[in-house]
């Protein structure tokens, strides 16, 4: 987490007041000792062909004109924990910052399809449209499932990962706070899924977000869907 969020949690949960600058110095010290690492950049995805199929190219739309559940960003990353390499799929909702994540043994379109179906079952908001990059995992069966569900599927232009910045930042958060966390001892996909479910719940119901005025994603959704 950033130094500002750490300071808020310390004050909120432990009644300990530490300045952001002090938190920053502690974080810098840990970084200098090699105890904090950054997420590695991923290789560029291949171009998407829009001549056939359900997907359509991404077009600019003002954030203020979007509704809850519109252009939900989905992405995947490769991660290794305790010798187990997994494909981590994640969805990020722009308005509430709500995320859902799941892991699979491969990053094929079948996995992306399974993830989409699971997301639709657990999301506490109506999913109106999906936004992805041009990766092959978001073609074939994934695209067909979006069409079957009548979900708009928008694909980013090549070399524009910043347009999926929300889910990219969420990926980095889970790489640092989950996969790089030494206290998590899970060493199988099943055990990692169990721990990941708990980590996702904590992110959505406990972690404060300054973009939400200190509220959690679930608090934001409850207020705005009331």
What label would you give each PLM region?
Residues 68-100, 111:
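An active-site-proximal beta-strand-loop segment
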Residues 129-134, 148-166, 182-187:
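RNase H-like polynucleotidyl transferase catalytic core
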Residues 84, 101-125, 129:
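Active-site beta-loop-alpha junctions of metal-dependent nucleic acid enzymes
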